[in-house]
Amino acid sequence: MGDEVQALVIDNGSGMCKAGFAGDDAPRAVFPSIVGRPRHTGVMVGMGQKDSYVGDEAQSKRGILTLKYPIEHGIVTNWDDMEKIWHHTFYNELRVAPEEHPVLLTEAPLNPKANREKMTQIMFETFNTPAMYVAIQAVLSLYASGRTTGIVLDSGDGVTHTVPIYEGYALPHAILRLDLAGRDLTDYLMKILTERGYSFTTTAEREIVRDIKEKLCYVALDFEQEMHTAASSSALEKSYELPDGQVITIGNERFRAPEALFQPSFLGMESAGIHETTYNSIMKCDVDIRKDLYGNVVLSGGTTMFPGIADRMQKELTALAPSTMKIKIIAPPERKYSVWIGGSILASLSTFQQMWISKEEYDESGPSIVHRKCF
């Protein structure tokens, strides 16, 4: 695998697919992980209607389509649609021939073995890639931060994981998953804005609320105190202009929505918040490496982009950890794409080139080769 062929890096998230070329510092293509099919066949005959649409095109035509997310909580659940997303990635977004490039794919922590095999099989048999590799998302985020040991709190659109990593290897017994992420926060914000008298119900309106969330929400350092401030003054109020020109005002919703990350009971969930989950993950690790984990807590994924989240994590973990423990939260500015960036770094390392699963190895051993070569 010489330098003349650029490897492709594809990070398939529940909400967005990030794709591009190894060695680049950012993904070339970022589009929604959705596949849409016409609700009524035959209505648009003669308009050159396709039987399916992917990504932004599906998003823009959603009025006439039924939308599906093939990746739920980070795990691929619909392989036919997943294949369509990959096809769209290669041919429409990156405009490359997959049979000419090695492909690095990412997977969720604790991804079922059968899923890794299926990804491997599709790459070699459907797309005829010359070589491929499957890497764990959180591990790539850690690499992107320049570390090989630490605990990654990776929170995207569909799922949140805490993943302790020691010298480059994820520790599976200590990985914890929380089914609370960006999509849930958007839904919760829709709900509390409705209480204020604004109605957001359709999928189109959900996109507006997602934008409000991304632009105006933040994490309070002290929730109770912030609620008190919001009640006694209008200092925290912000206005937002809707696409139709109407202007809405949003106050304590700005920090009430992301607070659910720390208090899942807001969403009617019984699970521990992200701070406790991180702590529980660390406590499942050998006592000798805990210090290294507390000192390297790396935030990753779009749902860690809220202003104030790092300071709040620092405060909450300090309260949980032994009093002498040094705690450091690392929040890289590019953390929305750090999984992809880590993949770009890994796939362009000269030492990584012998790690690829080649077509020859696949033909000889079959899909199970992925468990021997990717760990």
Curated annotation (Swiss-Prot):
Under the heading CDD domains, the entry gives: ASKHA_NBD_actin
GO cellular component, as recorded: actin cytoskeleton; cytoplasm
Q: What does this protein do?
A: Actins are highly conserved proteins that are involved in various types of cell motility and are ubiquitously expressed in all eukaryotic cells.
Additional information: There are at least three actin genes in A.castellanii.
What post-translational changes are documented for it? Met-1 may be removed after translation.
Question: Where is it mainly found?
Answer: cytoplasm
Show which residues constitute the signal peptide: none
BP GO annotations = phagocytosis
Q: What is its EC number?
A: 3.6.4.-
Quote the InterPro entries the UniProt record gives: Actin (IPR004000), Actin/actin-like_CS (IPR020902), Actin_CS (IPR004001), ATPase_NBD (IPR043129)
Annotated PANTHER family: ACTIN
Keyword Oxidoreductase among UniProt keywords: no
Q: Which family does it belong to?
A: Belongs to the actin family.
Q: Which UniProt keywords apply?
A: ATP-binding, Cytoplasm, Cytoskeleton, Hydrolase, Nucleotide-binding
Under PROSITE patterns, the record lists: ACTINS_1 (PS00406), ACTINS_2 (PS00432), ACTINS_ACT_LIKE (PS01132)
Locations listed in the record:
Cytoplasm, Cytoskeleton
Which SUPFAM superfamilies is this protein grouped with?
A: Actin-like ATPase domain
Which Gene Ontology molecular function entries are recorded, alphabetically?
ATP binding; hydrolase activity
Question: What is the protein's name according to its record?
Answer: Actin-1
List the Pfam families. Answer: Actin (PF00022)
Q: Can you state which reaction this protein catalyses?
A: ATP + H2O = ADP + phosphate + H(+)
Source domain of life is Eukaryota
